From Swiss-Prot:
Keywords: Acetylation, Endoplasmic reticulum, ER-Golgi transport, Glycoprotein, Golgi apparatus, Membrane, Phosphoprotein, Transmembrane, Transmembrane helix, Transport. The record marks K8 as: Ubiquitinated. Forms homodimers. May form a heteromeric complex composed of ERGIC1, ERGIC2 and ERGIC3. Within the complex, the interaction with ERGIC1 is direct. Interacts with ERGIC1/ERGIC32. Interacts with ERGIC2, the interaction is required for the stable expression of both proteins. Interacts with MARCHF2. Interacts with SERPINA1/alpha1-antitrypsin and HP/haptoglobin. Possible role in transport between endoplasmic reticulum and Golgi. Positively regulates trafficking of the secretory proteins alpha1-antitrypsin/SERPINA1 and HP/haptoglobin. InterPro entries: Erv, Erv_C, Erv_N. It is a multi-pass membrane protein. Glycans are attached at N265. One of its GO terms (cellular component) is endoplasmic reticulum membrane. Pfam families: COPIIcoated_ERV (PF07970), ERGIC_N (PF13850). This is Endoplasmic reticulum-Golgi intermediate compartment protein 3.
Length: 382
């Protein structure tokens, strides 16, 4: 018993008898409000604890031979699908080989509504034209090239063959004077889509090297190791490259990613504008808390625009160009659970802090009320 008596001397929380305790309405109000605040702060701390935190790290990118997946969804409200070509080039200006892609073109009317329910699958570097059914023609025929024959081009059985032959000569005749083009409805196709727009969506998988992909009018080809587009045969007088980028990303999305070009609306101030997007791609590895590893990319971008009146030379080519280069550094983002001890510390701080503040407020209210009451009572006696 003597030992217990000595132990009581260390009690930092001495108790008073119940008869000497005074309960007030102000104290009850402070208790209820502080209890609600304590519960709210506890739930906030619990929610914070249940979320994961992401730790970034920076490494040198040592990956080799990987592919770069480019997700595309771009609308051209004033550029018909029949006129639009899409190409992927490497840093040297050569057309990329072994490019896997799944791109589609959707014709749009002037209000942006799809003209047809099905989109056309697009081949890189080609424009879409309606081809006459070959079943009714002699498969062994050899039709005229209209004076544009060459050593490797003796027969021109399609409008595209005639256009290619004349392209090498530097000029293309009126398609209405060429039997193959009349038969395939080349002019009708161009006229039919003249006031339409086009939505291009899908993905490209290119080699993981610096390069570009672009949307430009006309048929593309290589001439003396220079990439050019044939616009003459399409009769394009007013090239409007106004565009709306619904989505553009390099790889899969991960939680919290920001694609800076999403929902970008650009209006061409005049005809024949060339829009260039200079993109810096940063390889990124995102490791989820369950162990799943996601290899993707982030990117930053700057935009430049100018008038392009020429088909070759410094004036450039009307269109939308995305020129990308890859960073030598890699970002690793790792999801981790938050510390349980940190959660306990936060809860204790909330409870202790609220009790302390509530006690101070209650004491202030109680003693202030007593002081006021004393003055009132003193005034009555005098």
């Amino acid at each position: 018993m003597e030992a217990l008596g000595k132990l009581k001397q260390f009690d930092a929380y001495p108790k008073t008898l119940e008869d000497f305790r005074v309960k007030t309405c102000g104290g009850a109000t402070v208790t209820i409000v502080s209890g609600l605040l304590m519960l709210l702060l506890f739930l906030s701390e619990l929610q914070y604890y249940l979320t994961t935190e992401v730790h970034p790290e920076l490494y040198v990118d040592k990956s080799r031979g990987d592919k770069l997946k480019i997700n595309i969804d771009v609308l051209f409200p004033h550029m018909p699908c029949a006129y639009l070509s899409i190409d992927a080039m490497d840093v040297a200006g050569e057309q990329q080989l072994d490019v896997e892609h799944n791109l589609f073109k959707q014709r749009l009317d002037k209000d942006g509504t799809p003209v047809s329910s099905e989109a056309e699958r697009h081949e890189l570097g080609k424009v879409e034209v309606t081809v006459f059914g070959p079943d009714s023609l002699d498969p062994d025929r050899c039709e005229s090239c209209y004076g544009a024959e060459a050593e490797d081009i003796k027969c021109c059985n399609t409008c595209e063959d005639v256009r290619e032959a004349y392209r090498r000569r530097g000029a293309f005749k009126n398609p209405d004077t060429i039997e193959q083009c009349r038969r395939e409805g080349f002019s009708q196709k161009m006229q039919e889509q003249k006031n339409e727009g086009c939505q291009v969506y899908g993905f490209l998988e290119v080699n993981k090297v610096a390069g570009n992909f672009h949307f430009a009018p006309g048929k593309s080809f290589q001439q003396s190791h220079v990439h050019v587009h044939d616009l003459q045969s399409f009769g394009l007088d007013n090239i409007n490259m106004t565009h709306y980028i619904q989505h553009l990303s390099f790889g899969e999305d991960y939680p919290g990613i920001v694609n800076p070009l999403d929902h970008t609306n650009v209006t061409a101030p005049q005809a024949s504008m060339m829009f260039q997007y200079f993109v810096k791609v940063v390889p990124t590895v995102y490791m989820k808390v369950d162990g799943e590893v996601l290899r993707t990319n982030q990117f930053s971008v700057t935009r430049h625009e100018k008038v392009a009146n020429g088909l070759l030379g410094d004036q450039g080519l009307p269109g939308v160009f995305v020129l990308y280069e890859l960073s030598p550094m890699m970002v690793k983002l790792t999801e981790k659970h938050r510390s349980f001890t940190h959660f306990l510390t936060g809860v204790c701080a909330i409870i202790g802090g609220m009790f302390t503040v509530a006690g101070l407020i209650d004491s202030l209210i109680y003693h202030s009320a007593r002081a006021i009451q004393k003055k009132i009572d003193l005034g009555k006696t005098t």
